[in-house]
Each structure stands twice: as structure tokens, then as C-alpha cells.
Amino acid sequence: MLTTSSARFDVAVVGGGHAGVEAAAAAARCGARTALVTHDPATIGAMSCNPAIGGLGKGHLVREVDALDGLMGRVADAAGIQFRLLNRRKGPAVRGPRTQADRKLYAAAMQTAVAETAGLTVVAGACEDLAFDAEGRLCGLVLADGRTLACGAVVLTTGTFLRGLIHIGERQIPAGRVGEAPAVGLAQTLERLGLRLGRLKTGTPPRLDGRTIDWSGLEMQEADAEPVPFSTLTERITNPQIRCGITRTTRAVHDLIRANLHRSPMYSGGIASRGPRYCPSIEDKVVRFGDREGHQIFLEPEGLDDPTIYPNGISTALPEAVQRDLVRLIPGLERVEILRPGYAIEYDYVDPRELDLGLQVKRLPGLFLAGQINGTTGYEEAAGQGLVAGLNAARHAGGLGIAGFDRAESYLGVMIDDLVTQGVSEPYRMFTSRSEYRLSLRVDNADARLTPRGIALGCVGGHRAAQFAAGQAALGAARARLDAVSLTPSQAAPHGISLNRDGIRRTGFQLLAYPEIGWADLAAVWPDLAEVPPRIADRMKTDATYAVYLDRQNADIAAFRRDEAVRLPPGLDYAAISGLSNEMRVKLETVRPGTLGQAARIEGVTPAALTLLAAHARRGARAPSAPADRHPA
């Protein structure tokens, strides 16, 4: 651990949460000398809210982080205690891997992963300010104790710490999370630098003592019999798998909440900022969905040897006494004890439209932001941004250009494009529905989509690269074998495979596209196929199922990339474009899109404005002196 008064690094990352660890590890994997600055190294990898990783859309992000050799997938596999594949009955494109995680195991595994990352130094301290040289260029950090860290790039991953304020009923407690001081000086620095700041809110439920819950009458949710790991490097899940309980709120609970709404800061005027739409407080649920008989609550154990229960579904900021009365009106919780009250927390965030596609602040080269500071919510969203910001910080420190990810290749690209193009008015979370190319962006092909890119960018290590090459070779061999065998309808019939009597010969791959034909059916015809590992067989089935649809989607992707190829100069003077209305100029200047495609995704930008931009871009491309955009889409 660093103890000197000053030191020189290539990259300094502020914050040891889910964004910070991925940013620091990614920068270090890219060869940058990296510092991870955190108040308390013992809190690295802490799960501040729910004890779970993954889910719908979120599981895709974890797989993509893993494909780029990030940490979250491997750590979740090491700490997972209830693996479930969500949306199992739906198509492969929208299935989402998820696991409950043992909090202590998760933090311990993450801290081990950080400690084992070459080139990464953990620095205990609080970042109070940014340092700039005589020319106004960012050159380091100033810590609260007076130490300075000189560096070539900074990544801020401050979570809920920027002027964080906890609310419990009428009480207000300045804090980044329970028991930890907020980052006030750093928020003032960002304000002084002229960045557009806003205020958001999130919340968490009370923690319950599982030993005081009556589990006997509750529905129990089992883990999957065969856990699906997040990381392609994980051979098997070794932790015991646990069950979660399910209960519901009642009319009595709703009546109590309504009677005390005036004491909730969201309804008393104590909090004016917006919370996450898809993770509302129990107060919001009762107000917005007043006709419902009850709301489901998942009672999630926080560890294998920890009696603490996370009641997923009743986030609240009501006074502690009301919280106690509230939970004791819920079936199974009549005698429950609260270990820690729920609370809401407000915090500052930076308008993500200040950023480019590499998560660098446009007006402050070398400063990168990731996680809740960009207006997102969720561990997985934070981890994905952290990885992208970290690898780009390393590139900036090394004199290289920004590397962006586009919407057609990853959910990382979808998320970042949404943030920097649309901005946020409430905490942003990922869903598969946000992607227009989700048939291509599946959890099962994240490595095929992104690992080659990661190898080219230098953030994928040799072990993963070798494992990926072996996996791709196995997929290629399986596909070649399927393409080499075929059957006519009359040949298929004796094997119990029913096809239209059209006389057409179909390859093994084409046969696999039929919903009723599985790998076992083909192996009964060609026995050597039984030797193909299940993971490879499942991937072949998915590829065959989606083949026709992917051909159509690839045409859409080609059109998308044509617009993305029309670059707009970063210093473009929109006032000089004749015919643009003042409204269009304001929208474009706020985002400063890098491509015509990104401009088209800005809310309210008209086709007429896009035509003017396209004409201007074509004229600029013909002019030898036209500035080039160094930020690829």
C-alpha cells in the first residue's frame, strides 16, 4: 500500500466499488501503472445494496465484462450461492443469468483479484481535489491528507458519495453509505470546472434477522439444479446452493404506509430528486399501484453463515419505528427483528452528455467517469462502464486514441451510447429491450463478439486468449461437421425426424433450426456428434435457430454502420451550418455527437437537420483541412 507523500502513476482510479475495481484492473491489464484510491481498502468489492449479480440485461453486461477479461464474472462465480437462469422459457437472446452472492465471499474474492493484478497499487485515502498543470491539463489527484498522486489520467467512480445524503424518515445524515463520509470537496471541484451536475436518489430496504423469520409457511425458491456460471473461465460452481423465501405485502401494510406517507422524505418534500423507475420504494409502489392486493418480496440470504436477510421489494425511507411495524405486518415476519433500517440516499451525478464514447469528459481530456456518477444504477452497469473507462484511461495515458464500443456489437455500447446521447432524468438500468440488435447480442456469444476486440486493445490476458482460441476452434469444428452431413426427408423419417416431403436435402445445421429437433436427435443419426460438449451443442442450436433472423438483422447493422461512418468533427460550429434552427443547435451542442448516426439518436433532432449535417460532413470530408474525429463510434 502506498504511504509516500507523492507518487507517479499512469492512471489513478478513485473509488473501490464495482466500477472502480474494473477500471483499475482494466487499466493495469493494458500495461498502465495504476493506483486505486479508496477510503478503506477493506471495503473494496462491497455489495452496498442487494446481494446479487446479473439478471435480465444485467447478466449480458457481466458476460461482456468477462469477455474483456474483467473481474465481476469470475468473482460472482466464486461467491454465488443461488444461481438461476431467468427467462429460461423464452428465447436465448433474452435469458439472463443471475446469482445470489455471499457478501463476504464476494468482497474477499474481489480483494484477492485486485491484489493479484500486476501493476495495480491500492492507495488508502480520500480524493479531495484534482490537480492541473500550468497549461490547465489534468495531472493528478490531491488527497485529503495532503498527499498528491501525479498521473496521466484519472477515473472517477464515486458511486453515491458525491455530497451523499442519507434519509431515514425526518433524519438526514451526510454520508456516501452507512458509516462513511461523503465526498464534498470533489463534488465542489466538478462544479467549479463547469460540469453540468444533477441530483439523483436510490434506496435500500431494512436488513432482517433471518433467525426471527417464520419460514414454515413461506413459498421457497430453489436454485437451478445445474448452475450456469458467468465466466467462461469457471469450470464448475463449488459453493452450496441455498433457497430464497417469497412473501407478499398485505392491505394492512399498505394502509400503514399510506397513514405515514407524510413522514417519508419522498412525499414530505425532503427529497426532490428522481429515483430508479424499475426499483421503486415500497411507498412508491403503494401510491402508484394502489389497487394491488400485495407486492412480492424475495427474502434473500446475504451469506452462507450470515443470518442477515435482504427483503428485496421493500426499499423504504420511512422512520425506523414505522419500518418495524411495517415488516411485522408481512406474513412470516410477524416477530422479525430489524438489524439495520432501510434508507434513501441522494447524491450528485454528472450529466453523461458531457462524455464521449470512451467515457472521457469532452472538455477535460484525461478525466474519465464511470458508474453512478454518470446517472446509472446497478453493480453490472457500473462494472461495464468501469472497464471501458479504465482501458481508455490507459490508452490516453499512453498517447493513444479513445476506443469506443458500438450498439451493434455489445450491450456496453448500447448503454454508453444511451448515456452520452440521451442523458438521464432518472437512474439508468439495462434491459435487453434497450437493444435493437438483441438477437445478435446474446449471453452465449459475448466472448465471440468482444474477446477478439479485447485482445486487440490489450486488455485480455494470455490465459483467456488461449481458452477463447480453443473454444472458437471447437465451435468451428462442430459447425463444419454439421455442414458436412445431410439428410433428405425420406432418409430422416426412419430416425424419427419428420420433415416436409419436398425432397430437399438439409444439412445438420439446417435440421437443427427446427424447434422440435435437438442435438440428441442428430447424434442418433451421426453418433460422433454425441462427443461434442453440451456448451458447444447448445451454441450450435441457438445459432441455427436464429440464422434466418440474423441475416435480416445483419442488413440493419450494415445500415447502422453506414451512418456511424459519417464522422462529425469534435469542434463543429453548429451556428455556421445554414438552415439549422436554434432548437436543433442547442440539442446538438449539448451532446456534440461524433457521428451522423449518433446525431440521429438525439431526441428531437429532425430528418431535415440530419440532411444538413450529412451535407456539411460530406463537404468537410472533401476539404483537406477538415478536422478528424479521434473518437470512433
Swiss-Prot record:
PROSITE patterns assigned: GIDA_1, GIDA_2
GO terms of molecular function: flavin adenine dinucleotide binding
Main location: cytoplasm
Protein name: tRNA uridine 5-carboxymethylaminomethyl modification enzyme MnmG
Assigned GO CC terms: cytosol
PANTHER family per UniProt: GLUCOSE INHIBITED DIVISION PROTEIN A (PTHR11806), PROTEIN MTO1 HOMOLOG, MITOCHONDRIAL (PTHR11806:SF0)
Organism: Methylobacterium radiotolerans (strain ATCC 27329 / DSM 1819 / JCM 2831 / NBRC 15690 / NCIMB 10815 / 0-1)
Pfam families: GIDA, GIDA_C_1st, SAM_GIDA_C
Locations listed in the record: Cytoplasm
Subunit structure: Homodimer. Heterotetramer of two MnmE and two MnmG subunits.
Keywords, comma-separated and alphabetical: Cytoplasm, FAD, Flavoprotein, NAD, tRNA processing
Function: NAD-binding protein involved in the addition of a carboxymethylaminomethyl (cmnm) group at the wobble position (U34) of certain tRNAs, forming tRNA-cmnm(5)s(2)U34.
InterPro entries named in the record: FAD/NAD-bd_sf, GIDA_C_N, MnmG, MnmG-rel, MnmG-rel_CS, MnmG_C, MnmG_C_subdom, MnmG_C_subdom_sf
Annotated residues for binding of NAD(+): 275-289
Family, per entry: Belongs to the MnmG family.
GO BP, one annotated term: tRNA methylation
Residues the record lists as binding FAD: G15, G16, G17, H18, A19, G20
UniProt cross-references to NCBIfam families, sorted A to Z: mnmG_gidA
Reported cofactor(s): FAD
